[in-house]
């Protein structure tokens, strides 16, 4: 199983599937469709049924039930795209057998080193087979490891018909990294009662709480006049933008928060004297505090408008997704089953909130309750990304164990 997982991850990683938030198509990039079509062929090859791909690149497939029992249909999902934070072009994965616990030179010429001094958890992987980058791209284990694990678990179940299970649905989706993963996902066609995204990080992660999330674009407009004759006339949009940001609570930013703490995150600032725009994301686990944060943004804008004029500041704010806990709590047994599956395999479940979102955040509000389980990866979205192949085996085994437990409980 381990070699199969490594082969799959490497072959998927080599397809550039970075999504693009400025594109209006679905999927947002052609590489995602290329990988989706590869996955369709592979699903057919391993013996999955009802394999489909729609015009938006959503792949679905079925493993039919092999039990007499009435078992609820469950699904497993992963996304094909990689993050916009770092290049996913020409990914060249490195396989390190029997990792010795020391520095890993990812790229000698560029002096890129993956070191336990910088990443202390790396030392815990001594003895593991690791898959790393070559120091010039991300790896794409987020979420191609999830795809590999789902595919390998399905192949295992097909090869072992003595393992009884209900109907299983599988889906591979585009554009998760730009928040659009579920936008064109056909929940009705998928037709599962519950599902799991296989999109978590280190071994044992089990998540059913996500942020409430909004995006805000603040546009500040000024009046540009020759600086030599600007007294009493110039209004500097860049300075209005600086005042806006300075009015937000300084310590409520990603670099100062953890656990259940929310934040305002300035993604980008662009502009000049005439016009400057600020792009933020707003995050909180608690719905009331989330709404308070959005109110704070609006109040600061209103104060600046009072000072500089009605058209000086505009706020364009929209909600992106909500904390899936609200939709999963009523069917908490799906979390309990995943918890028990890990325990059965001597994996210590690490139940913690996702300081982010998954496709499951939105799908849970679309009628498909969808917690998240680990892939085994670390340091997603950058050149220091790596994954333990040994823990990928454990993730695939957890999928198999979840399926068994649903059948046993029926």
UniProtKB/Swiss-Prot annotation:
Main location: cytoplasm
Residues annotated as binding Zn(2+) 1: 79, 142, 199
Binding site for Zn(2+) 2: 142, 177, 381
Compartment annotation: Cytoplasm
Family per record: Belongs to the peptidase M20B family.
Cofactor remark from the record: Binds 2 Zn(2+) ions per subunit.
Gene3D superfamilies: 3.30.70.360, Zn peptidases
Any single GO BP term: proteolysis
Protein name, as recorded: Peptidase T
InterPro entries: ArgE/DapE_CS, Bact_exopeptidase_dim_dom, Peptidase_M20, Peptidase_M20_dimer, Peptidase_M20B
GO CC terms in record: cytosol
Essential cofactor(s): Zn(2+)
Keyword set includes Metal-binding: yes
Enzyme class of the recorded protein, top EC level: hydrolase
E.C. no: 3.4.11.4
Catalytic activity reported: Release of the N-terminal residue from a tripeptide
Keywords for the protein's UniProt record, in alphabetical order: Aminopeptidase, Cytoplasm, Hydrolase, Metal-binding, Metalloprotease, Protease, Zinc
Active site positions: 81, 176 (proton acceptor)
Record PROSITE patterns: ARGE_DAPE_CPG2_1, ARGE_DAPE_CPG2_2
Function summary: Cleaves the N-terminal amino acid of tripeptides.
GO molecular function terms noted in the UniProt entry: metallopeptidase activity; tripeptide aminopeptidase activity; zinc ion binding
